[in-house]
Amino acid sequence: MSFQEVWEKEPMKKPRIQKITVNFGVGEAGDRLTIGAKVIEELTGQSPVRTLAKQTNPAYGIRKKLPIGLKVTLRGKNAEEFLKNAFTAFKACGKVLYASSFDQVGNFSFGVPEHIDFPGQKYDPSVGIYGMDVCVTFDKAGYRVKSRKLKRSHIPKKHLVTKDEAIEYIQTKFDTEVVRE
């Protein structure tokens, strides 16, 4: 029985996107970080959170707790729309998604080297080019029991998202090819 048949028969077993985390590692504070915040806000429609340096690195001029990156967490419809655009940009630069990018519970990550590959984006010399990491986290209906405050419980192994389920979901929903090695 294929995953599609199981998901139609038992909708609670169908995986869904819990969240998408978009990370801009700018590497420096100042104007480049401010411009990057505008770029990420334009791409996602949400204002980013600044990420801080964890340690001092004098070779790069970075001090501890200095803002050097940006991140945004997307959920729901915004997450699905952004992922469609991110896959378009990912394919535009000639990259493919490998099965090794998926972990054992179905989460996966990929990088988009240039933000100008997104639909509707054009190169602006005053902005430059920014790359980003996109991390996708999956869950199924009923996962709330492991994170709620009262009567917290564990998720049984048979209800966890598997690597193969996540690959099947991405291939059918987003029409993206996943290369198995």
UniProtKB/Swiss-Prot annotation:
Any single GO BP term: translation
Similarity comment: Belongs to the universal ribosomal protein uL5 family.
Transmembrane helix among keywords: no
PROSITE patterns (UniProt xref): RIBOSOMAL_L5
GO molecular-function terms, A-Z: rRNA binding; structural constituent of ribosome; tRNA binding
Subunit details: Part of the 50S ribosomal subunit; contacts the 5S rRNA and probably tRNA. Forms a bridge to the 30S subunit in the 70S ribosome.
Stated name of the protein: Large ribosomal subunit protein uL5
InterPro entries: Ribosomal_uL5, Ribosomal_uL5_arc, Ribosomal_uL5_C, Ribosomal_uL5_CS, Ribosomal_uL5_dom_sf, Ribosomal_uL5_N
Cell cycle in keyword set: no
A GO CC term attached to the entry: ribonucleoprotein complex
Functional note: This is one of the proteins that bind and probably mediate the attachment of the 5S RNA into the large ribosomal subunit, where it forms part of the central protuberance. In the 70S ribosome it contacts protein S13 of the 30S subunit (bridge B1b), connecting the 2 subunits; this bridge is implicated in subunit movement. May contact the P site tRNA; the 5S rRNA and some of its associated proteins might help stabilize positioning of ribosome-bound tRNAs.
SUPFAM superfamilies documented for this protein: RL5-like
Keywords: Ribonucleoprotein, Ribosomal protein, RNA-binding, rRNA-binding, tRNA-binding
Listed Pfam families: Ribosomal_L5, Ribosomal_L5_C
